[in-house]
Regions:
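Active-site neighborhood of phospho(di)ester-bond hydrolases with catalytic His/Asp-centered motifs
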Residues: 6-7, 34-38, 63-67, 136, ...
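Acidic, His/Gly-enriched loop-helix segments that form or flank divalent-metal centers
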Residues: 95, 100-224
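N-terminal active-site segment of His-dependent metallophosphoesterases
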Residues: 1-53, 57
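Glycine-rich, phosphate-binding/catalytic loops in enzymes
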Residues: 22-23, 50-54, 79-82, 152-153, ...
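Catalytic metal-binding/acid-base residues of hydrolase active sites
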Residues: 10, 41, 68-69, 139-141, ...
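Active-site neighborhood of divalent metal-dependent phosphoester bond hydrolases
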Residues: 30, 44-126, 131, 157
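Short glycine-/acidic-enriched loop or helix-start segments at secondary-structure transitions
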Residues: 16, 46-47, 73-75, 145-146, ...
């Protein structure tokens, strides 16, 4: 089996499709498997196209739940957007799914959008594990101490059995910091998304490249 792994598409369907095509992904090849490590929607303008493509062309894709999926569900269940839903692009996703020209109240739009996405949400998992890899969104559940200068340490129990709230927290974690501080899966490589790769190059490689702006390195970061 050959795995094609992407993360944080954020409704940029065109860029996503171009990337997997260039990588050689063939949805008709039974030896090819697509893994998406969360955050399918928000920010870009093509959530509907992305959802239709995954449902129709890649129904066997492995979909891992991200923090933006949590944000989407919580906003839809509230029936109203909060300030962070605008800044994160979640509110706009509702309009992209339901059509900006319809004179519907937001609460009804949210109900319709959630109904559209529910089958995809039901396919999502917290993690996917193979003999050599673990795929997640932020990181595996662990203990986070302090808020600003986060310190991470492993759970005493098996992370695979962590409750729902622990997985929701883990979807926000900086996986590069977690790995550097010893939260690992022995004998396996953890593949994550969520955090910008330029952070790892800037903070851990200390090669003079900035975290953001001109010269930042957004290529995949490989921890030791």
């Amino acid at each position: 089996m050959k795995y094609f792994v992407v993360s944080d598409i954020h409704s940029f369907f065109g860029e996503f499709k171009k990337a997997i095509d260039e990588a050689g992904f063939d949805p008709t090849d039974e030896n090819h498997r697509l893994i998406i490590c969360g955050d399918l929607f928000d920010r870009g303008s093509q959530p509907l196209e992305l959802m239709q493509h995954l449902n129709e062309e890649v129904p066997n894709a492995i979909l891992i739940r991200g923090n933006h999926e949590d944000l989407f569900v919580k906003m839809c269940e509230r029936g109203e957007p909060w300030m962070h839903d605008y800044s994160n692009g979640t509110a706009q996703t509702i309009f992209d799914f339901t059509g900006v020209d319809k004179p519907w109240p937001f609460e009804y739009r949210a109900e319709v959008a959630l109904g559209m996405v529910r089958p995809m949400l039901n396919r999502m998992v917290d993690y996917y594990e193979t003999d050599h890899y673990v795929f997640v969104h932020g990181w595996i559940p662990c203990v986070k101490e302090h808020h600003r200068l986060a310190k991470y340490r492993p759970l005493e129990e098996d992370w695979r059995d962590a409750p729902k709230n622990k997985w929701e927290d883990a979807r926000w974690y900086n996986g590069m910091d977690c790995a550097a501080q010893g939260v690992v899966v022995p004998g396996k490589t953890v593949v994550c998304g969520h955090w910008h790769c330029s952070y790892g190059h800037w903070f851990y490689e200390n090669d003079g490249k900035p975290e953001f702006g001109e010269g930042a390195d957004f290529s995949p970061y490989y921890a030791n």
